[in-house]
Every structure is written in structure tokens, then in C-alpha cells.
């Protein structure tokens, strides 16, 4: 854990961001702006090709920012590359079902895809909007079934996305960020990570509090 924390503070950690939409792409830009190397993952070939060509498909994210980010960022559809990153942020959609519950199918599919490629001492954070209990019920078992002990040799956090797309008054950098972790160590790492790119983090006592 100490090595992971220092590598984040020294901008040596490689950040993997899964889901390159209106939540994931601004995070790509912020981590790049602060000096991190970033790998973006998406199942959409067209999005990946556009980003690697320096093109933006999100109205409020200017093309110049994408072109500039290519100095330290690339996008891929190859999820086996998860084993090459230190931090994994899951930013996939969780649209509401007819019963007004978040549909977790994209999260579940992502976890199934990346499970074989997880490695020791990674930090995995869910950003997708969801209901209390999701991180413990969906993410922790996947990590444990891959052979890791959460809080000891693999770390899990939750930080709800707080994007306000296109609002010039608020940006990824300035909107306060709620952060939580499965354990004290997990919270410490999650807070240290976002502290690199967000002006104000708000650590809370548990995953469920952050998910509310």
C-alpha cells in the first residue's frame, strides 16, 4: 500500500479509466493535466478510434484537449491491458430500470471482463451512480474470487461521479468529491488519488454512505 500511495503522489501510477463517456473522459483529461499516464478502455471501437486520432465526441470537451492529452493518454478496446495499470476507475453507465433502480449490467459485464487481468496492489474504484451496497455486493466478491484480500493486497473504493456536463462554473477539478473505501487503507488510497486532481475531497465513513 505504501508503494502505491507514493507512486500516486509522485504521479508514477498508470491510471486506467473504463467507460469513456461524459464521466470518464473528463477524468482522463484531469489525470493527464496533472502529469499521469492514462489508458482509457471502452467497448466502442468508434470512440476509441476517434480519441486516438485526437477527436472529441463530447460537445463540451474541446478537440484540442484530446489532442494534447495524447502525449500521455491512449484509448483501447483491449481489456487485458488492465494488468498494466495501477488504478482502475469504472465509469460505465448505470441507467435506471423501469422500477427506478440502477441497471448494473454494464458494471457486472465490466467486472467479468477485467477479473482475469487484476493484479496485486491495484486500486479499483467504482464511479458509476448506484444504490447502497453495490460495491460490497458486486465488486468485492469479484476481487476476492480472483484470489486477493481486499484491504491487504488489493484495494477497493467508491466515489460517486459528480459531473455537470458543460457547466462553465463547475469542472471536474472544482466540484467537491465524496470518497470512500472498503477499509481504512482503501479510503486512504482513494482519498490520496483524488487529492491529486480535485481541489476538495470529502472522505466519508463507509462505502454505503458514499453510495446513498
What are these regions (language model features)?
Residues 90-92, 128, 182:
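Glycine-rich, N-terminal phosphate-binding loop of Rossmann-like dinucleotide-binding domains
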